Design a protein with these regions (language model features):
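Alpha-helix N-cap/helix-start capping motif
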Residues: 80-83, 103, 139, 159, ...
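Conserved phosphate-donor/acceptor-positioning beta-strand/loop module used by diverse small-molecule
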Residues: 89-112
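PAPS-dependent sulfotransferases, especially Golgi type II membrane carbohydrate sulfotransferases
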Residues: 44-73, 109-155, 162-238
Length: 238
């Protein structure tokens, strides 16, 4: 979906430290859930208790990421599953900026399908129908947050980013409250560890060849098209 490329661009800025796929938000969200579940029905006056819980959770995440924010004034957390926790993120860090990386749904799902993730919570990536179903759920969730938090969530389309990089990069930086720096256009020169399948992509200047890469496999993707409610002829909505 372009998350690695987007993070590499932002991490090329002098004020941003790239954090990669962090698990901290998921961990503190689960801890909050367990805490609140253990109390059953919250008693009167629970607003103060919840506020204290949120402060403690925010402090815990801040402590988990201290190795990042001590280096630069901002850092990125590009865990893809963070879209499930945008509400929690906003409660813990109301000033956080969320960049929603979006790409053609067929291209996104095929990219997931072609990667051997191993065991875990993304076994749906081995089935085209399930992939499409999960993607549709993700779309509905993001439609909600784009409406509810328009000033905190920015949608960036991969196709637009590779077509007009300078315009889109400026838009991202402005959203994040950062001044433009030429290094963000020269992101492929940044030497930092990248532990994702998109490593090769960000070691080169922006290129467009991957935009329609999915069309090479189009005849095999009928279950995915059906699950997404798209036309196989062009990947668009019927």
């Amino acid at each position: 979906s372009g998350t690695t490329l987007t993070e590499q661009i932002l991490a090329s800025h002098s004020q941003v430290q790239g954090g990669g796929e962090l698990t901290g938000i998921i961990r503190v969200a689960k801890e909050l859930g367990k805490t609140w579940e253990s109390r059953g029905n919250l008693a009167p006056g629970s607003d103060e208790m919840v506020a204290q819980d949120l402060r403690q959770a925010a402090a815990r995440y801040t402590d988990m990421t201290s190795h990042l924010w001590r280096k630069r004034s901002r850092f990125t957390d590009k865990m893809p599953m963070n879209f499930l926790y945008i509400g929690v993120i906003h409660l813990l860090f109301p000033k956080a900026r969320i960049v929603y990386c979006r790409r053609n749904p067929i291209a996104t799902c095929l990219s997931c399908y072609q990667i051997l993730f191993g065991t875990g919570n993304i076994l749906y990536s081995y089935d085209l129908t399930e992939l499409g179903q999960v993607y549709k759920i993700h779309e509905r969730i993001m439609e909600h947050w784009l409406k509810v938090l328009p000033e905190r969530v920015l949608e960036v389309e991969y196709e637009q980013l590779v077509e007009r990089p300078e315009t889109e990069i400026n838009r991202m930086l402005e959203f994040c409250g950062l001044e433009f720096e030429p290094a963000c256009l020269d992101f492929h020169s940044l030497d930092r560890p990248i532990a994702t399948a998109s490593l090769v992509q960000v070691r080169k200047p922006i290129y467009k060849t991957s935009v329609d890469h999915w069309k090479n496999y189009e005849t095999f993707l009928e279950p995915l098209f059906n699950a997404l409610g798209l036309n196989a002829s062009n990947g668009d909505s019927p």
